[in-house]
Amino acid sequence: MKKNIVIVCLMLLSCFSYAQNERTETLVQSEAKGWEYELKAGVNIGGASPIPLPKEIRKIKGYNPKFNGSFEGTVTKWLTPKWGISASLRLEEKGMETDANVKNYGMEIIEQGNHVAGYWTGDVHTTYKSSFVTLPISLNYHLANRWKLRLGTFVSYRMDGNFSGYVTEGYLREGSPIGEKVSFTNGQIASYDFSNHLRHWHWGTLIGGSWQAFKHFNINAELTYGMNDIFKKDFKTITFDMYPIYMNIGFGYHF
């Protein structure tokens, strides 16, 4: 997926170079009627997190946002010189890597091919990565000649995803917080994989802004907040909801 987004971004740069020299009569007429078209590329920085952090997570020991590319096409209709509405189609990745120290954290490890569920106390390493097709819809406001603000909502469909990792330097209480103790110390690890429990459909809110750096070139920033858990409703191993929260930073070319 990452390779595909890089290829698309290179194609986008080629389109920019061509578009600087060629603007069709159709685009000129559309602009006169209040229509605006933009191609965007960016990077998502953030992660999936419970809000607020639950008592089970005692310490965040490490965080890596990874490279989460995005590519987007946007159509905007300006209803007045100040107000407009827009719809986009976005291909994007969202992910992160974290290291945390936890206590009585819901867990199902894989030990010698068997799944053992219970409550983990110790260190947890998590890798999360998903690819989405996203449809954002927003209300736009021209704050000044070069500044534009937007507020809206989005719906996303997850095409693929991974939520996995390992536990180490701690112990698992099987079944309950007072169950049989299984220890993993001195570098021993046990893996886990919750990828099959990831939800396909996501929705949420967005707020963002754009600055027109040049005649057709914009710098964009947008914060998205997912309103539903990244896991399916019937997944009970992790006892708290995890919400995708990401800041997208990038650039765009409007025709």
Regions found by a protein language model. Name each.
Residues 20-76, 226, 254:
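Short glycine/proline- and aromatic-enriched beta-strand/turn motifs that initiate or cap beta-hairpins
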Residues 82-85, 146-149, 215-221:
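Repeated loop/turn-to-beta-strand initiation elements of outer-membrane beta-barrel proteins
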Residues 47-66, 94-131, 158-200, 229-246:
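Extracellular/periplasm-exposed beta-strand and loop segments of Gram-negative cell-envelope proteins
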Residues 77-81, 141-145, 213-215, 255:
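Outer-membrane beta-barrel strand-turn architecture
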Residues 35-37, 67-73, 133-137, 203-207, ...:
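Hydrophobic, lipid-facing positions within transmembrane beta-strands of outer-membrane proteins
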Residues 211-215, 243-255:
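Outer-membrane beta-barrel "beta-signal"
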Residues 19-38, 81-82, 104, 163, ...:
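Outer-membrane beta-barrel biogenesis signature
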Residues 39-45, 87-93, 151-157, 221-225, ...:
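Transmembrane beta-barrel strands of outer-membrane/channel proteins
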